[in-house]
């Protein structure tokens, strides 16, 4: 064991997972081959998104699975269990890449608030139809993406790498984590996106550090939510099993590699694009709020024109790096 270096560990984990996946294939083969054969490919995309941006895998899984006639409650339960695994792997890989990307002192406080929120939302106040809450969350997240756009356009500085845990800061972190835990228990994701904006907007934390820390928090909270679902509700193991190959590859290898290569600016642009697309898809397909086709089309196309304008303006600005203010994902030396 002493001769194993940290570069070999992901390959060992992947080999173990591959053996176990093949071993359990007879138990899940029918569902995998007839219903969920696409999940490994979707898992690659979702896990890459979840482990490179502050948008959890649920932002990919939830709208797609519900359109494929998976019940929303089942989609939420699946989202938590696959994030517990995939973002857990991603957190471990990021720790191997550069442990200085984590703000360790805030995680216990935020995890406590998040777990309390998850317990309340899953155990005491579960909701059967999370579509409206998803729409509201996506709308708020879309509004918050404007902060990222203007921070890039005006080259805002994010000088801090840590947070002083005084009373006010603890209350802010705990309060928003509690709210994020409630949302995550209901729709399967949310605390990571919320936590990222709190770190960058309120505390001026480097985005690279904020992204990785938010990933670790969502991973830990997904584990807690999954345990609660196992105890009080159901866990869709067949869908989870089907997604494992793609999630393993992305979590252990692809996500961190892409983040390092893309850099913080491009990762943030990817993040804003994903949140925007998710909002558009949710708005266009939702039936919770009655909106006419004309109004829906006008809102969607107006927002698309606005986003195209913003992106063109950013790219015309011509800088490929935003200095050290956004931090770096590069490996720890």
Identify the function of each model-found stretch.
Residues 48-59, 184-192:
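Short helix-coil transition sites and intra-membrane helix breaks within transmembrane domains
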Residues 58-101:
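Juxtamembrane transmembrane-helix termini in multi-pass membrane transport proteins
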């Amino acid at each position: 064991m002493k001769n194993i270096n940290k570069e070999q560990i992901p390959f060992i984990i992947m080999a173990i997972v591959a053996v176990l996946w093949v071993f359990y294939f007879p138990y899940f083969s029918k569902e995998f081959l007839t219903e969920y054969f696409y999940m490994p490919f979707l898992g690659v995309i979702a896990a890459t998104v979840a482990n490179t941006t502050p948008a959890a895998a649920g932002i990919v899984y939830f709208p797609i699975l519900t359109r494929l006639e998976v019940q929303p409650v089942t989609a939420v339960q699946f989202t938590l269990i696959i994030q517990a695994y995939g973002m857990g792997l991603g957190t471990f890989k990021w720790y191997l890449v550069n442990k200085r990307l984590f703000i360790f002192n805030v995680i216990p406080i935020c995890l406590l608030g998040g777990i309390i929120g998850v317990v309340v939302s899953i155990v005491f106040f579960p909701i059967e139809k999370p579509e409206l809450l998803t729409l509201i969350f996506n709308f708020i997240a879309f509004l918050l993406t404007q902060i990222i756009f203007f921070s890039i356009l005006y080259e805002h500085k994010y000088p801090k790498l840590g947070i002083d845990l005084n009373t006010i800061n603890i209350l802010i972190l705990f309060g928003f984590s509690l709210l994020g835990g409630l949302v995550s228990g209901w729709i399967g994701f949310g605390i990571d996106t919320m936590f990222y904006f709190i770190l960058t907007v309120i505390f001026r934390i480097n985005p690279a550090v904020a992204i990785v820390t938010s990933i670790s928090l969502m991973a830990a909270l997904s584990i807690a939510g999954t345990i609660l679902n196992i105890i009080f509700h159901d866990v869709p193991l067949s869908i989870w099993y089907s997604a494992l190959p793609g999630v393993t590859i992305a979590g252990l290898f692809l996500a961190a590699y892409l983040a390092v290569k893309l850099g913080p600016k491009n990762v943030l642009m990817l993040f804003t694009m994903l949140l925007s697309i998710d909002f558009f898809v949710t708005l266009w397909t939702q039936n919770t709020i009655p909106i006419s086709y004309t109004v829906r089309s006008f809102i969607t196309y107006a927002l698309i024109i606005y986003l195209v304008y913003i992106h063109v303006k950013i790219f015309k600005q011509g800088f490929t790096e935003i200095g050290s203010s956004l931090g770096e994902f590069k490996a720890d030396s």
